[in-house]
């Protein structure tokens, strides 16, 4: 008993439907023929395993007449289809034809149909020449074709499949040689030939053909060896002698059949499902097959949705009225409850969520309290400073003190004096007298106020109104040392960015270098430089 025969055969036949859609759209007659013949043989083996499970009774005679001939045809059709496939792949990889025309496709289709279907029919008819009786019935295996084992039978039944397998291996070798010769530009070569093949499809086809051919050679050789071991080579005498008592049906019950014959029959039976699995393994797991599976699944799901009664999904939604969230969400609102609303009083007091940080959400106040630090906020800006003179608007530093201009100051020499810092009434945070950013030195004119550039003025000529200060700027980063500042001449921290001066750079004052040829690019109030500055275009008089 072999209870596994029927399910294995039927599953093998069903697995051929996986790569079928892609090959059907490609219109490859050779691969479609392989699928068709493997499907036929698997169905025959499965039906035989069901009918003759544990028995060898004579039944379904007409069915056996048909299936035995189809089995003979399948032994020829599979190597013929592999030969057609290898011929096509070798022609695609070669450079004998630049492009494939419609006439070439039509001739190829006719040739493949003749090789895959007409030639097996011819050999099915030729098998009648070496058919000694009607058929055999083996227990658990069903009906099998009967062959008069002789020299003509070897050349009719076994030699043609071996010859086609050898020719297929030659064409497959040439195809691989062409591929290796132009493997770097093979994809462009396939595109230039207007072929539907890609490099991956080409490799899968050629590898499948080679593996199938090797397997068919092994199968045919084993069948020939098994027949020679179990049957004696008989001489071909006459037609009448060979076909005498032709309507006889030979039965082989398991109890009287030699064990070697049963083992050989079991081995030959498993070769057909193995050939099917080899073919499916090469094409059922590629990108094309996966895309086809997705498309079929979408079609099935869309059909299932259309088959559902109208309003089925809405009824399911109404059934969720009493459904609540999982247990880790506390205080949740039941779904589908029409009485719930977005008002604060209808929401739960507190909801605990499964997060990494300890977060507590209070819905009544719409605030979130977490362990994270509070967001940074900028401090409020200081109140604007007020100036008593229009010249204060030219001050570079926003933290400069108030300035007043006096008419009693010697404007010809621009005497600059440094006075102690006077607290500003307009600044909210007056600078410290000891601050290093604003160096000061004592002055004889205590009523004078010094700005950031150490120009002095008296409050007599100050304007009666105040001018708001410009936006606050950061304090200067560099100030001169105390040793370089004298009461008679003070050095500004950096030159002002006045429009008349093209650029500003950090240099020593021109007073220290009177013969310097450099243009004066900063306001020099020294009397010795007054006439010198008028000569240079960058100077200021």
Curated annotation (Swiss-Prot):
Function: Receptor for the BBP1 pheromone, a prenylated mating factor.
Coiled-coil ranges (or none): none
InterPro entries (alphabetical): GPCR_Pheromne_A_rcpt, GPCR_STE3
Keyword field: G-protein coupled receptor, Membrane, Pheromone response, Receptor, Transducer, Transmembrane, Transmembrane helix
Subcellular location: Membrane
Extracellular compartment spans: 1-3, 55-69, 131-150, 227-264
GO BP terms, alphabetized: pheromone-dependent signal transduction involved in conjugation with cellular fusion
Biased composition (Pro residues): 372-385, 467-478, 493-502
Cytoplasmic side: 25-33, 91-109, 172-205, 286-541
Membrane-topology annotation of the record: Multi-pass membrane protein
This protein's GO CC annotations: plasma membrane
Domain of life of the organism encoding this protein: Eukaryota
Residue ranges of the region described as Disordered: 364-393, 414-541
Major subcellular location class: membrane
Membrane-crossing segments per the record: 4-24, 34-54, 70-90, 110-130, 151-171, 206-226, 265-285
UniProt-recorded Gene Ontology molecular function terms: mating-type a-factor pheromone receptor activity
CDD domains for this protein: 7tmD_STE3 (cd14966)
Bias type Low complexity, positions: 420-429
Name this protein carries in UniProt: Pheromone B beta 1 receptor
Family per record: Belongs to the G-protein coupled receptor 4 family.
């Amino acid at each position: 008993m072999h209870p596994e025969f029927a399910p294995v055969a039927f599953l093998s036949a069903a697995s051929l439907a996986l790569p079928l859609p892609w090959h059907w759209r490609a219109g490859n007659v050779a691969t479609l023929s392989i699928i068709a013949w493997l499907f036929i043989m698997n169905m025959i083996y499965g039906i035989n395993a069901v009918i003759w499970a544990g028995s060898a009774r004579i039944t379904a005679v007409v069915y056996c007449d048909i299936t035995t001939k189809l089995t003979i045809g399948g032994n020829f059709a599979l190597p013929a289809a592999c030969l057609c496939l290898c011929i096509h792949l070798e022609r695609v990889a070669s450079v004998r034809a630049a492009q494939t025309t419609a006439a070439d496709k039509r001739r190829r289709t006719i040739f493949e149909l003749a090789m895959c279907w007409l030639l097996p029919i011819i050999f099915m008819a030729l098998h009648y020449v070496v058919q000694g009786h009607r058929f055999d019935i083996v227990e658990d295996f069903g009906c099998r074709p009967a062959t008069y084992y002789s020299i003509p039978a070897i050349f009719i039944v076994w030699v043609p499949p071996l010859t086609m397998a050898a020719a297929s291996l030659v064409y497959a070798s040439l195809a691989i040689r062409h591929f290796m010769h132009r493997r770097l530009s093979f994809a462009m070569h396939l595109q230039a030939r207007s072929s539907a093949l890609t490099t991956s499809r080409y490799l899968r086809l050629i590898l499948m053909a080679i593996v199938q051919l090797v397997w068919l050679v092994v199968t045919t050789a084993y069948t020939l060896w098994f027949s020679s071991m179990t049957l004696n080579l008989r001489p071909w005498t006459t037609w009448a002698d060979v076909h005498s008592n032709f309507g006889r049906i030979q039965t082989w019950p398991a109890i009287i059949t030699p064990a070697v014959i049963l083992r050989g029959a079991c081995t030959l039976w498993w070769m057909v499902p193995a050939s099917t699995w080899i073919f499916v393994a090469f094409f059922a797991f590629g990108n094309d097959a996966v895309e086809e599976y997705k498309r079929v699944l979408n079609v099935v799901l869309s059909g299932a949705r259309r088959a559902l009664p109208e309003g089925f999904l809405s009824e399911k939604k109404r059934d969720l009225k009493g459904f609540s969230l999982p247990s880790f969400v506390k205080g949740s609102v039941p779904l589908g409850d029409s009485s719930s609303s977005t008002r604060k009083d209808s929401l739960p007091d507190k909801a605990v969520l499964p997060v990494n940080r300890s977060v507590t959400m209070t819905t009544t106040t719409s605030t979130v309290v977490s362990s994270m630090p509070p967001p940074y906020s900028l401090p409020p800006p200081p109140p604007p400073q007020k100036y008593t003179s229009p010249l204060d608007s030219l001050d570079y530093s926003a933290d400069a003190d108030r300035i007043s201009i006096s008419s009693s100051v010697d404007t010809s020499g621009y005497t600059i004096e440094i006075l102690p810092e006077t607290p500003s009434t307009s600044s909210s945070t007056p600078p410290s007298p000891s601050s290093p950013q604003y160096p000061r030195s004592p002055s004889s004119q205590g009523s004078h106020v010094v700005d950031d550039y150490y120009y002095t003025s008296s409050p007599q000529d100050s304007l009666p109104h105040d001018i708001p200060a410009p936006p606050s700027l950061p304090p200067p980063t560099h100030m001169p040392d105390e040793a370089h500042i004298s009461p008679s001449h003070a050095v500004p921290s950096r030159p002002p960015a006045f429009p008349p001066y093209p650029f500003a750079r950090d240099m020593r004052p021109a007073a220290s270098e009177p013969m310097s040829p450099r243009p004066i690019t900063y306001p020099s109030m020294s009397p010795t430089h007054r006439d010198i500055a008028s000569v240079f275009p960058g100077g200021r008089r």
